[in-house]
């Protein structure tokens, strides 16, 4: 075999994925520090991956999710300690721009929450709030976002119709398009399919899998089946503690902690 053949047969090494979110020694308190809901959370979430947070109700999943873009700041009497970094930037630094942070880290909520305006105006709402007025730019981003959200073909002829006239599944995909329009690096999703029927759920799951190539996605879910279907990594929380965090296949086939095994096998009480 000559040198040219050797060079041809060498496969290029894949670049290791960067850490998108680093959470270190993170604690969270409600009620002016009297009630602790998260205890010493440590984890690293890789870029362009899907990570699901699982665990019983009240275990801290959503609290941690909303801490990643500081939505919990809107609640009176909360306190935090530790660090959360987004692509190595401390989100609690004194000079952080909260508006920019929430642009880079988009949020999709449990219940679809389109604004009572047109489909088009929903998608470009955030852009207009940033001062973007050029209609050509707004039109382009609207179309791109709806295409990415797998909704364009269904709404391209009714963009000026009320968003509230869409089905529940369409409304949730519209909310995803609205988040995408802001060109985030990360998408946070808080049980985005819990209010949807099985067919609409499947469409959103297919969309999320497709979005992974461009975004880092962190999703809270109560559906263990959903976690196994779509996520690369799974974190199991219990009573405010991160019990186990690993590749999803390992969590569901060979968990290291007995409490994780009990939960995924339905023995949690």
Curated annotation (Swiss-Prot):
Its EC number is 7.3.2.1. One of its GO terms (biological process) is phosphate ion transmembrane transport. The gene is pstB. The complex is composed of two ATP-binding proteins (PstB), two transmembrane proteins (PstC and PstA) and a solute-binding protein (PstS). It is a peripheral membrane protein. It is an enzyme of class 7 (translocase). The keyword Flavoprotein does not apply. ATP binds at residues 55-62. SMART domains: AAA (SM00382). Residues 21-264 form the ABC transporter domain. SUPFAM superfamilies: P-loop containing nucleoside triphosphate hydrolases. This is Phosphate import ATP-binding protein PstB. Its main location: membrane. GO terms for cellular component: plasma membrane. It is found in: Cell membrane. It catalyses: phosphate(out) + ATP + H2O = ADP + 2 phosphate(in) + H(+). One of its GO terms (molecular function) is ATP hydrolysis activity. The keyword Glycosyltransferase does not apply. Belongs to the ABC transporter superfamily. Phosphate importer (TC 3.A.1.7) family. Pfam families: ABC_tran (PF00005). Keywords: ATP-binding, Cell membrane, Membrane, Nucleotide-binding, Phosphate transport, Translocase, Transport. Part of the ABC transporter complex PstSACB involved in phosphate import. Responsible for energy coupling to the transport system.
């Amino acid at each position: 075999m000559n040198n040219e053949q050797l060079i041809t047969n060498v496969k290029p090494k894949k670049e290791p994925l960067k850490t998108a979110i680093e959470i270190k020694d993170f604690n969270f308190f409600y009620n002016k520090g009297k009630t602790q809901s998260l205890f010493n959370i440590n984890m690293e979430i890789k870029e362009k991956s899907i990570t699901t947070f699982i665990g019983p109700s009240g275990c801290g999943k959503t609290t941690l999710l909303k801490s990643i873009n500081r939505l919990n700041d809107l609640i009176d009497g909360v306190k935090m300690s530790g660090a959360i970094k987004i692509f190595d930037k401390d989100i609690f630094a004194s000079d952080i721009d909260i508006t920019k942070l929430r642009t880079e880290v988009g949020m999709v909520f449990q219940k679809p929450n389109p604004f009572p305006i047109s489909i088009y105006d929903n998608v470009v709402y955030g852009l207009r709030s940033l001062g973007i007025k050029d209609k050509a730019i707004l039109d382009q981003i609207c179309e791109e976002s709806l295409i990415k959200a797998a909704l364009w073909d269904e709404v391209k002829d009714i963009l000026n119709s009320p968003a509230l006239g869409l089905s529940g599944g369409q409304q949730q995909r519209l909310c995803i398009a609205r988040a995408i329009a802001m060109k985030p690096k990360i998408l946070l999703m808080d049980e985005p399919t819990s209010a949807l029927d099985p067919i609409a759920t499947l469409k959103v799951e297919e969309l999320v899998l497709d979005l992974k190539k461009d975004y880092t996605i962190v999703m809270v879910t109560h559906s263990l089946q959903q976690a196994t279907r779509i996520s690369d990594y799974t974190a199991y929380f219990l009573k405010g503690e991160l019990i186990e965090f690993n590749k999803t296949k390992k969590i569901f086939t060979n968990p290291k902690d007995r409490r994780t095994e009990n939960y995924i096998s339905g023995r949690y009480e």
